[in-house]
Regions:
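Non-catalytic, topology-defining segments of multipass membrane proteins
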Residues: 1-73, 77-78, 101-198, 253-284
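Histidine-centered catalytic micro-motifs
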Residues: 74-84, 111-123, 211-220, 238-256
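Juxtamembrane helix-capping/reentrant segments at transmembrane boundaries
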Residues: 24, 86-106, 126-136, 222-235
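Alpha-helical transmembrane anchor segments
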Residues: 199-238
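Generic recognition of well-ordered alpha-helical segments
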Residues: 98, 209, 237, 261-265
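Alpha-helical hydrophobic/aromatic positions enriched in membrane-embedded helices and signal peptides
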Residues: 30, 64, 71-72, 208, ...
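Juxtamembrane/interfacial segments around transmembrane helices
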Residues: 87-94, 115-120, 144-154, 219-230, ...
Length: 284
């Protein structure tokens, strides 16, 4: 028997929605707005901290929390830029990526290549540069960081990256050191510590949890089976939609703010491929 007109029409509408949803946005304004919000928040927090004359426990905590909140946005922005989803031009994506990885003290061109290798070899103990995140407790991450970061850079170096990427990252690192020095001189060491350095550490730890450990731990290095999707609504604002990370590994150029809609549209396909989805109920 043929499909009914209603079913045919519904199928066509779904196909049209999918084409629009998975198309490049041209200019991804939600990500640009996130970048503006991040920079505005970080600058305001540091200016606020610069005016502090007496550092009580509450004031220290206040600036750590505000700084961590805004630095949590950094990953999403440079990650989108690394995948080329913010602009069509690669150079424009790289400028935005470098500008938004910089306050998190992340060498953008190194991490861009690292991330592409991660996608190529997800959960491979030898070739995934991010596998070290999964090799111990999330609580021990700060102690494992130097060794893990060194291993990741070694894998990136073996990929044959050009000298200009290395030199640009070194230049950006020098700018970080200059900014730290200026911050200490113009404000105070405590302002730099509580409004920038500690928030950077906490934001990196949070990213490791929801981008590496939560989606990838104890999963095989197999397409469709290597990354989880969590559909709980409360995780969406906390992770900036990266609770749908399994969706990203299948369609890496899908913008972050489209993940929930894309999941609803593609859930049957994802389940048919055995993608780990939590919770299992379709009411989620």
């Amino acid at each position: 028997m043929g499909s009914s007109p209603k079913n045919t029409e519904a199928g066509e509408l779904e196909k049209a929605e999918a084409v629009k949803l998975f198309a490049h946005p041209g200019i991804d304004f939600p990500t640009i707005l996130l970048a503006v919000a991040m920079w505005a928040g970080l600058v305001a927090n540091f200016a606020w901290a610069a005016g502090v004359s007496e550092w009580t426990a509450w004031i220290c905590l206040r600036h750590i929390l505000v700084g961590t909140f805004f630095l949590n946005m950094s990953f999403t922005i440079w990650h989108e830029a690394a995948h080329g989803t913010v602009f069509r031009a690669r150079a424009a994506n790289d400028v935005l990526g470098a500008l938004t990885a910089w306050p998190a003290m992340i060498p953008y061109f190194t991490v861009r290549r690292d991330h592409n290798l991660h996608h190529d070899f997800v959960n491979d103990p030898e070739r995934d540069p991010d596998f070290w995140f999964l090799e111990g407790s999330i609580w021990s991450l700060p102690f494992r960081y130097p060794k893990g970061a060194k291993r990741a850079v070694e894998i990136v170096d073996r990929s044959g990256r050009p000298a200009w990427e290395v030199n640009l990252d070194r230049f950006l690192l020098v700018l970080v050191l200059v900014a730290l020095g200026l911050g200490i001189w113009l404000a105070s060491p405590l302002a730099v510590l509580f409004a920038w350095i500690l928030p950077k550490g906490f934001a990196m730890w949070i990213h490791a949890w929801y981008v590496n450990v939560l989606p990838h731990r104890d999963l095989p290095a197999e397409r469709f089976h290597d990354t989880r999707i969590y559909t709980q609504a409360w995780l969406v604002p906390l992770t900036i939609c990266h609770s749908y990370h399994g969706l990203h590994h299948i369609w890496p150029t899908l913008p972050w703010h489209r993940y929930p809609r894309a999941f609803r549209l593609k859930r049957d396909f994802l389940e048919s491929r055995g993608v780990p989805i939590f919770p299992r109920s379709k009411t989620s």
